[in-house]
Amino acid sequence: KLWYFVTFIQSPPGFGKTSLLRIFYPTVLKKIVSHNTETRDVFEALNKLDVKDKNRIKRCAVYLLTRSDYALIDDEEMYSRAEQTSLFLALLNVRFVIATIKTLMRLTGVGSEDLYKIAYTPQDANILDAELDFPRTRCSCKDLLDWASEKEKEIYKAINSFEREGNSVFSCSSLFVLPLMNVQWFSYPGHTLCEEFIFQLDDAHKLTKEQRSTLEKVCIETRLNVTFWIAERLDNLVSSELLETDKQERDYQVIELDKYKDKKSIEFEKMVKLIANRRSTYAMADIDLMMLLANSDEGEWEQKYRAGAQKYLHKLSTNPEIRSYENLIKAIESIMDIKERAYNARALLMF
């Protein structure tokens, strides 16, 4: 039940949940080919999962990282619980539209100045139920981006305002954009897109308790009929907050990466193990920081971190695709702490 189903992916810190999600990025999937010995095993796993074949990408990620700013919405002095829920869902919706456009740009190679060339043609009557004045007729990705950007600004204005301006709270009760971001409704001349999007919400543990409860409730009650993966740290959950087992399998499933032994999904389990063991291979780096430091004596740690930092900074400085991050690279180079320099360089490289 990986496809067209809601899946909660839970793991302890550092077990590789984010690396697992990122393997489905369009840019990463393009690098995984059958004739490359370095990626052949991952390609075969993806092929068996019907994610990619030798000719094209079939499924790819629309990735959204949970930010800490969602917590700003939980202001009981400013908004009622219903209004907080509306703002939370509205913000998630507009950000998933932006994330979808980013995925389409990576699939097509289109830059932001040519987004008008990617057409969006909704074909389902459910478009009439869209909220937040979502575009209901044929338009371009440029139009969608303008809509989402403007709505995000309005939501931020409402969140950051110290005074209520009339009743201008956004009315939103569902994750309505997920089924509307149907890849079949997008087209780009001379380019074949994928068959399905995998919507991903990473670091969901950063949501407040009420927001996480709202997310779970919306996923169950709406029956989204999309592939939606929600990744969160297991250590942030207590037994009373874990998902209700009587609703699992029917409405959603839970995968604990450190315990996943479902024989019915053996191919996905293999995929999990591959990514956990090789989580750095597809991040443009040819050194795994954990392997670099593994089994080293305590007295050697500074030399190991220094070597790692130098390697990653060299990769960053020689990669033409990330020249726009020169200021960040300079800032990392100026970090005095060797360990912090290595980790920050690697983080930017993976990004």
Question: Where are each of the predicted segments found?
Answer:
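Short glycine-/polar-rich loops that comprise or flank the Walker A/P-loop
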Residues: Y4-F5, I57-C60, E195, R223-T227, ...
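Hydrophobic anchor at the beta1->P-loop junction of P-loop NTPases
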Residues: I9
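The conserved Walker
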Residues: P13
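Conserved lysine of the Walker
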Residues: K17
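P-loop NTPase nucleotide-binding core
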Residues: R22-V183, Q248-F351
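Conserved Walker B catalytic segment
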Residues: R164-A231
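Short regulatory helix/loop adjacent to the ATP-binding pocket of P-loop NTPases
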Residues: L237-Y252
